[in-house]
């Protein structure tokens, strides 16, 4: 093949690749748009059902077309949860009306005991994310008010948070809790500190996270349940399933979000230990590089006693499998 023929051949091949890539990319883009519209349609179906049958309450019960509230008084769980999704889907008109309803209606001066963990990740987190999207200072003021009402949970002898707090009186209860509820708060409380300039939120929850980590076993694992007044474990089953999973998740996320070196160190140590004692497939080890340990992902994670590493279960759940 002479030079001219070679150039023509290479040009034709290049054009072919460009055409294939263009049509493939176009098809993928169209498919993504179609999928996005399908998701939006399903969201609207659920949202309109909530508006028709459960407006002003926490949740829709779709089969009975009625509503459910988590506590004696509603806290608008669904509207707060859904608001940032509306903005991300481009539903600004509906979102603005919902935001006004939330800021006009939702009050926290209620004589009810709430679960600190759920209220933090759903209501406090929802208010903060929507403030960051909209810049509506009413949302930040509401988050600050709620955060202040939640702070008494940290007033235990250990600094580990109680499970429940009364939003009006500040009284607490629920001394037996779990690592997910003691260690899955720092993103929300830390963000509240950054946005309000009040370090107390970050400091209180950072201490709770560290106190949880410091009570790990000699082989580096945490248990399922702990007493916040004594600091003693009441259930030594260790795993990455419900009641523990998000504790590990927040160690990593907080190291990234806040650049917290302590969280990074706790994460690296923790993931190494759970890969050593809980992972069922793969090499069960960490490799090293110049920047520190590189943890190998595993397919299955089991349950083991936090002190001995001896297996305590023979079944695996979804969270264990996809950690």
Where are these regions (language model features)?
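Intrinsically disordered low-complexity regions specifically enriched for long asparagine
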Residues: 5-6, 26-28
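Glycan-recognition and catalytic cores of secretory/periplasmic carbohydrate-active enzymes
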Residues: 27-322
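Bacterial N-terminal signal peptides that target proteins for export
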Residues: 2-15
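Bacterial N-terminal signal peptides
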Residues: 12-24
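Intrinsic-disorder/low-complexity regions
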Residues: 1-2, 319
């Amino acid at each position: 093949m002479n030079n001219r023929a070679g150039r023509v051949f290479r040009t034709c091949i290049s054009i072919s690749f460009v055409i294939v890539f263009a049509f493939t990319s176009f098809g993928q883009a169209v498919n993504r748009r179609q999928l996005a519209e399908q998701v939006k349609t399903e969201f609207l179906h659920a949202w309109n059902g909530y508006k028709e049958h459960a407006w002003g309450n926490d949740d829709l019960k779709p089969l009975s077309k009625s509503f459910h509230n988590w506590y004696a008084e509603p806290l608008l769980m669904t509207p707060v949860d859904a608001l940032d999704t509306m903005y991300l889907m481009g539903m600004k008109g509906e979102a603005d009306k919902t935001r006004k309803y939330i800021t006009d209606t939702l009050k926290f001066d209620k004589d009810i005991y709430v679960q600190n963990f759920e209220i933090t990740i759903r209501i406090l987190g929802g208010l903060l994310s929507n403030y960051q999207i909209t810049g509506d200072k009413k949302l930040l003021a509401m988050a600050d008010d709620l955060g202040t009402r939640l702070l008494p949970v940290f007033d235990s002898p250990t600094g580990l948070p109680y499970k429940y707090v009364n939003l009006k009186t500040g009284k607490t209860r629920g001394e037996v809790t779990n690592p997910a509820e003691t260690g899955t708060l720092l993103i929300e409380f830390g963000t509240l500190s950054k946005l309000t300039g009040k370090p107390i939120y970050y400091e209180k929850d950072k201490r709770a996270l560290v106190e949880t980590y410091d009570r790990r076993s000699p082989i580096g694992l945490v248990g399922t349940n702990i007493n916040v007044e004594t600091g003693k474990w009441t259930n030594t089953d260790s795993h990455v399933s419900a009641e523990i999973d998000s504790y590990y998740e927040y160690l990593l996320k907080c190291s990234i979000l806040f650049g917290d070196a302590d969280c990074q160190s706790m994460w690296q140590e923790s993931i190494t230990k759970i890969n050593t004692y809980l992972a069922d497939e793969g090499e069960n080890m960490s490799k090293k590089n110049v920047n520190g340990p590189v943890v190998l992902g595993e397919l299955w994670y089991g349950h083991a006693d936090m002190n001995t590493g001896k297996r305590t279960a023979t079944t695996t759940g979804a969270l264990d499998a996809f950690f």
